[in-house]
Amino acid sequence: MATVDRWLLPDGIEEVLPPEAARIEVARRQVLDLFQSWGYEFVVTPHIEYLESLLTGAGQDLDLRTFKVIDPQSGRQMGFRADITPQVARIDAHTLRREGPSRLCYAGSVLHAQPRALSSSRSPIQLGAELYGDASPSSDVEVISLMLAMLQLADVPDVHMDLGHVGIYRGLAQAAGLSGEVEQQLFDALQRKAIDEVITLTEGLPADLSGMLRALVDLCGGREVLSAARERLANAPAPVLAALEDLLAIAERLSVRFPELPLYFDLGELRGYHYHTGVVFAVFVPGVGQSIAQGGRYDDIGADFGRARPATGFSTDLKTLVTLGRAEIELPSGGIWMPDSTDAALWQQVCQLRSEGQRVVQALPGQPLAAARDADCDRQLIQQNGLWQVSPLAS
């Protein structure tokens, strides 16, 4: 490797330098404090695990995004975490094994073999919260509200939210007896709003089911979509109607809590279809081509770890949150310059100052006083009448 290439980083892998790294860390603490104030407990998951554990309950998309290695000790295949959510689900289902509702949150770096989108980072700092043990819409409203509170804390402007429910399509597909390749083809066509393909794929179905599946292409827009869905899906199976009622209940409560929030409904939006089981949601802002925070309900994942538990949650990339947010993140500025000295009294004074939260930078041999400014110091320790005192740094 040429010397010049030794400093190159892989595509999508970034360094974070001062002071941006400090801003991200301050934001991380603020968001985790917010989560804690809502009753969410912080957990730390491993960076690397055996692959069968890491990908349990996850879809093919997560498999493709996971860096894989061989453990030299066991010879087993391992993966670097690409999504912390399944790890937290395992903690709830297998490790904690609580009976009642459990609220957990996390923040940590993940690695993606493939980026989510062009120009996306492959090393985001994933941050999120999960609520386990309750299947009601109240839990979905809680995690969505927490996600929006997080965005308000960061002062992210012009937030818009998309809402959908995979149970609507899943219930119709099951009632129609769709499975395998046909269901996947219909799923793909719905994501592209390819109405001609949807019509072709549903031609052999009973008229009422084909009509309702085709209606999913058009059922997207504002609150009026929910009223239209009640009419056009009136003859749908009970699970579909229950899913629609859940979505209506969630939308009503969000409108009360966040009356200024633009809501967009898309009943054909099947983001995370093979992973989620209920409501799905995502937040978008103008000028960004992908969601900046997203989540949904995924009640089945705990079964893969020995105990099925209702679950709902969301995640975001902390670096994106800091970049888009307008909130002022105050960083400590200034400091105290201390001379290079063996004086025990000076050392005691410095220890006291640091314990009080003061930033004290020691001069190294040969450094002139002018170096204090380069170290962002605005004061200095000087000895007066045998005592070390803090005084302003001469300009």
Curated annotation (Swiss-Prot):
GO terms under biological process: L-histidine biosynthetic process
Subcellular location: Cytoplasm
Keywords: Amino-acid biosynthesis, Cytoplasm, Histidine biosynthesis
Pathway: Amino-acid biosynthesis; L-histidine biosynthesis; L-histidine from 5-phospho-alpha-D-ribose 1-diphosphate: step 1/9
Annotated Gene Ontology cellular component terms: cytoplasm
Additional information: This function is generally fulfilled by the C-terminal part of HisG, which is missing in some bacteria such as this one.
Family affiliation: Belongs to the class-II aminoacyl-tRNA synthetase family. HisZ subfamily.
Function according to Swiss-Prot or TrEMBL: Required for the first step of histidine biosynthesis. May allow the feedback regulation of ATP phosphoribosyltransferase activity by histidine.
Subunit structure: Heteromultimer composed of HisG and HisZ subunits.
Protein name as catalogued: ATP phosphoribosyltransferase regulatory subunit
